[in-house]
């Protein structure tokens, strides 16, 4: 069982991945609902995938739950958009430089979170390409097996087995 925080593109992506695997994907429909979803599926082996950039306040209760139940694991990339940027799908020195030192580029007066910054960066870098990104609806290019595998290289392999 994979519980994703996201109900948009990240959820669509991991749902597509699950078609080739032996796990089910459900959306928590927001970080504040993850704990409820864990309780709903706690008899299963669970992987939680959530945006580390925005997870903060929800962490304490979930960490306690993980300590009580060793069949729960957590993967917290900065955001789904960060995963895509990190995958090298976008061959850009600008993106590589930003990913090396994001704090040098993220301006807090412009972006409420790193997730929003990485979303804006991904949208900008893909706007006139076949990889055009929209947070609300995953472009079918990201459902291509080669592209999915490239993105999944950023996810620890043992988590998705």
Task: Give the label of every model feature segment.
Residues 1-161:
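Acidic, divalent-metal-binding catalytic cores of TOPRIM
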């Amino acid at each position: 069982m994979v519980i994703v925080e996201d109900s948009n593109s990240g959820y669509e992506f991991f749902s597509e991945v699950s078609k080739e695997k032996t796990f089910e994907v459900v959306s928590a429909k927001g970080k504040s609902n993850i704990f409820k979803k864990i309780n709903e599926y706690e008899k299963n082996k669970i992987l939680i995938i959530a945006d580390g950039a925005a997870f903060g306040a929800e962490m304490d209760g979930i960490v306690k739950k993980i300590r009580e139940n060793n069949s729960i694991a957590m993967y917290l990339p900065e955001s789904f958009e960060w995963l895509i940027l990190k995958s090298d799908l976008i061959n850009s020195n600008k993106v590589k430089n930003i990913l090396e030192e994001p704090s040098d580029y993220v301006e807090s007066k412009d972006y409420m979170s790193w997730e929003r910054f990485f979303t804006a960066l991904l949208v900008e870098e893909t706007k006139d390409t076949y990889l055009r990104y929209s947070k609300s609806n995953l472009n079918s290019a990201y459902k291509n097996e080669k592209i999915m595998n490239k993105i999944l290289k950023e996810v620890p392999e043992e988590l998705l087995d």
